[in-house]
């Protein structure tokens, strides 16, 4: 049909037009705005250079029967270190910080050598310690082999500085002077004719007792008994009973306050009224506490291996005030000598402008007239203190009283 043909032609034409139309591409999305430039990062401040730390070791018995003395010594070292850091010390053109490495030797020789090696391994520049001769002497070999200076504030056995080591120094008089002075005092002043001697078998106790006995005999007295115990003993009935039978005018004990206190109590219970003498190990307020009412006035006589009098006493008194304010306790015995030992060691470093032991050791050995709170400090060729003082004391009214300072 004509109409049908016409419609077919129209449809075909429409299809051709549709097939021939070119498709327009979709418009491209608008470009995102460029991000603002990030601010340049602020450079972090350069880290401060690490502090130049100088390690100084301290060793004493901070556990055991005489821990009160070991802690006293450690406090003396800590006070010195804190003051040095507050003041500021320059070595080799740099400000240095001192660090205290404190170790406990429990007054035991084996533990003493172990902590000595520990300090050597930690590369300390020097060591102040030990307290007891029995730990100081074996430890000194380790320090000597490492070339590390050692200053003992309290060891009195002469052997310590007579081993030929260049690294050993002491701050107090030795047993030759300590025991010798007490021996002469027992005979000449206390008028002791018969004297009993007890020691605790330690290097310190045995050493001071031997020197005391020699001096007694040289002064014309007689040693009527020699007994020994240990530094950990608590029962002395057997040896005191033996001594009582000898009726001595004086009983001398070479040992420490922790043993002497109970010994005095047992002397009272056995009705032994002899004078009681000892070295610096018993010359403490702790002895007075431990002995209690067993100590009669003018019964106990002792000598502290050190001491100051006259104008020099001002410095010691000022130290005691500082110590009490910082640690809320009184000085027990050797804290001032530890304090001085640290300062003497650092003064040698300053003089050498180095904390290298090899460089400052010669300066330490030539220390002369250093003004310490314990008095002037000078060392002789062996490392012993020159003109070491002794302070004679007695107990009256439950207090230690100074009788005299001797040199």
Regions found by a protein language model. Name each.
Residues 2-6, 10-12, 20-407:
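Extracytosolic ligand-binding ectodomains
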